[in-house]
Curated annotation (Swiss-Prot):
Belongs to the DXR family. HAMAP family: DXP_reductoisom (MF_00183). It is an enzyme of class 1 (oxidoreductase). The gene is dxr. This is 1-deoxy-D-xylulose 5-phosphate reductoisomerase. Its EC number is 1.1.1.267. GO terms for biological process: isopentenyl diphosphate biosynthetic process, methylerythritol 4-phosphate pathway involved in terpenoid biosynthetic process.
Length: 359
């Protein structure tokens, strides 16, 4: 298979499972972590590799090196593998998802932004979501037609215990302390702002075609999703917070090997479900509007991505993320997305607008 974003958290865990199950790796891609990429090259001996910056080419221990977005497209096209794991972070992963589907490859998707910004351009029946919530939903839905509502859970992120007034001056270091999951910087900030949960809701809509979706806080991250049925019953999916489970479910057809420990029900702490506070997590206010107009995902994602990286560089405060998103939405409204080129155009326009407005 092809693993894009191989040096990130999802990529590393995907390769762990690939090694365990003797899955051959035809191609790897990464951003800047050339040291880890070289270790992966030595272990998996891929036919091709792709890196972000051509300037780093001399550092890579490989002969067949592609570079940047154009290189990624060429590499995926040259690969014979029919299975692509896309674990690239952010909007940068969209092109790879599009080319993989165009070539008829099965897409194991950790890059949720592909669906957030361009869900209507994908055949989601050929996508396997690498996400604990969506893997849980798939298991719970299981061909049932009598679904009333879906729920995914949120931990509350790094600032669950913080008072609203204290969020104004939080540091990047504080924001990156996720209570339950070990993830990359971008998604950890998205978890703290609840933008991640907003994205997972629209992702679930594109994957399963159900608009009756909500999220609740379950701060232990032991319940990942719930499915409410018309007969009055509710099913819930429990597991430890470990991405290896949903990766294995996406990349292996059938397996009986355990990649994580089962929960010990008798040792499990008491669980509590809570409503998401819109005062503390104002971004989540956009849920119903986004489900009504999924094309808003292009504006929200571009704004969020731009603002999160500004925050990570200490160039703005944490609360500026939500403020900037609402500012962009006020300016652009519901975008007219008729073709995939419109997605790229709006993404560019939103970033340019915020670059001017948020100085």
């Amino acid at each position: 298979m092809i693993v894009l974003g191989s040096t990130g958290s999802i990529g590393v865990n995907t390769l762990f499972i690939a090694k365990e199950k003797n899955i051959s790796i035809e191609a790897l891609s990464c951003g800047k972590n050339i040291k880890l990429l070289n270790e992966q090259i030595a272990l998996f001996k891929p036919k091709f590799v792709c890196i972000q910056d051509e300037k780093d080419k001399h550092l890579v221990d490989h002969k067949n090196i592609f570079c940047a977005q154009d290189g990624l497209k060429k590499m995926i096209s040259e690969c014979k593998s029919k299975f692509v794991v896309n674990a690239i972070v952010g909007f940068a992963g969209l092109n790879s998802s599009l080319i993989a589907q165009k070539l008829g490859k099965t897409l194991a998707l950790a890059n949720k932004e592909s669906l957030v910004v361009a869900g209507k351009f994908f055949d989601t029946s050929k996508i396997k979501a690498i996400d604990s919530e969506h893997a849980a939903l798939k298991c719970l839905i299981d061909k049932r037609k009598d679904i009333k509502k879906l729920f995914i859970t949120a931990s509350g992120g790094a600032f669950y215990k913080y008072k609203i007034k204290d969020l104004k001056n939080v540091s990047v270091k504080e924001a990156l302390k996720h209570p339950n999951w070990s993830m990359g910087a971008k998604i950890t900030i998205d978890s703290a702002s609840m933008c991640n949960k907003l994205f997972e809701i629209i992702e679930a809509y594109h994957l399963y075609g159900i608009k009756q979706i909500d999220a609740v806080i379950e701060k232990k991250s032991l319940v990942h999703a719930l499915c409410e049925f018309k007969d009055g019953g509710i099913s819930a999916y429990f597991s430890h917070a470990n991405m290896r489970l949903s990766i294995a479910q996406a990349i292996l057809d059938e397996h009986d090997q355990s990649f994580i420990e089962n929960l010990d029900l008798l040792a499990m702490p008491s669980l509590k479900f809570e409503k998401i506070s819109l005062k503390k997590y104002p971004i989540f206010m956009l849920k119903d509007e986004l489900l009504k107009n999924p094309d808003l995902g292009v504006v929200i994602n571009a704004a969020n991505e731009y603002l999160v990286y500004k925050f990570l560089k200490n160039q703005m405060g944490f609360l500026d993320i939500s403020k900037g998103i609402f500012k962009a939405l006020d300016h652009f409204g519901v975008p007219k997305i008729n073709q995939i080129e419109d997605v790229f155009e709006y993404d560019k326009r939103v970033r340019l607008y915020l670059d001017k407005e948020m100085k």
